[in-house]
UniProtKB/Swiss-Prot annotation:
Recorded superkingdom: Bacteria
Keyword Flavoprotein listed: no
Keywords, ordered alphabetically: Hydrolase
InterPro entries: ApaH, Calcineurin-like_PHP_ApaH, Metallo-depent_PP-like
Gene responsible for this protein: apaH
HAMAP family: ApaH
EC number: 3.6.1.41
Catalytic reaction equation(s): P(1),P(4)-bis(5'-adenosyl) tetraphosphate + H2O = 2 ADP + 2 H(+)
A Pfam family matched in the record: Metallophos
Function: Hydrolyzes diadenosine 5',5'''-P1,P4-tetraphosphate to yield ADP.
UniProt-recorded Gene Ontology molecular function terms: bis(5'-nucleosyl)-tetraphosphatase (symmetrical) activity
Protein's name in the database: Bis(5'-nucleosyl)-tetraphosphatase, symmetrical
Length: 276
């Protein structure tokens, strides 16, 4: 029995199939974590989502920002974008069932000392706190007012965490931290503009996992989202988005041995044309 994690797929289903074949993944004995953004911009978002649903006994996902975008558009509260490849899902006879399945997926998964989220965990949040906050947003997603949640989800404010945050401002920050975070100011404020490499990062910013006051170093955090960061295994984090969508690689890591396996993506789209 092996336990693997794979980075952002974004509809690159052929690469996922090739990678699973390369590692010899067995749905009967092995387990697979996916770091979110399973859909959108790649050519086979529908097939990727169907795969996750079909194999939900062996495959676990966390929600990424593109998955949430699909849900917002699907429930009538988000505007489609030129780069979207989610229309086949929305037009499928089982589209609503697939959306409802996706809406029930978590923002955070923990198993022992390993935690998976899409983008990261705010430095000042201990893992137990992060689990609790993820639960707040998940309850809203699964509750009766989920459509209103999607109408309030978008936005970059508030930029900083405050325990006194309430209502949709609180939920928006929680979702942004788990699904959109890359760089932080030295006051741990979210910066959504910077998307390039750590090496090129302005001096007033730092990666979320480099904050000196991190309260979650007692767990290994597995995440994706930041394709410019690439594969990273340091500071008790494993970053797995290696830019399959952009013509890079799709990466799997064996979580027991930390051995990585990659497949080269076919083609890719021009990353300069869009913002992730």
């Amino acid at each position: 029995m092996a336990h693997y994690a794979i980075g952002d797929i974004q509809g690159c289903f052929d690469e996922l199939t090739a990678l699973l074949g390369k590692i010899g993944f067995n749905h009967g004995t092995d387990t697979l974590w996916l770091t979110g953004d399973i859909v959108n911009r790649g050519p086979k978002s529908l097939e990727t989502l169907q795969f996750c649903i079909r194999h939900e006994n062996s495959v676990q996902i966390v929600l990424g920002n593109h998955d949430l975008h699909l849900l917002a558009v699907g429930y009538g509260e988000g505007a489609p974008k030129r780069s979207d490849t989610i229309e086949p899902i929305l037009k499928h006879p089982d589209g609503r069932k697939m959306l409802d399945w996706l809406r029930a997926q978590p923002l955070l998964i923990r198993e022992g000392n390993r935690v998976m989220v899409h983008a990261g965990i705010l430095p000042q949040w201990r893992i137990t706190k992060a689990e609790s906050l993820a639960g707040e947003a998940e309850a809203e997603l699964r509750g009766k007012k989920y459509v209103k949640f999607f109408s309030k989800m978008y936005g970059n404010k508030p930029a900083a965490w405050d325990e006194g945050l309430e209502g949709y401002a609180r939920l928006r920050f929680i979702v942004n931290a788990f699904t959109r975070m890359r760089a932080l100011t030295f006051k741990n404020e979210l910066d959504f503009d910077y998307k390039s490499t750590v090496k090129k990062m302005p001096l007033y910013l730092r990666p979320w996992f480099k904050a000196p006051d991190r309260q979650n170093l007692d767990h290994t955090i597995i995440f994706g989202h930041w394709s410019s960061l690439g594969y990273t295994n340091a500071d008790n984090v494993i970053s797995l988005d290696t830019g399959a969508l952009w013509g890079g690689q799709l990466t799997a890591v064996n979580l027991e041995t930390e051995e990585i396996t990659q497949v080269q993506a076919a083609g890719g789209i021009d990353w300069k044309s869009f913002t992730k």
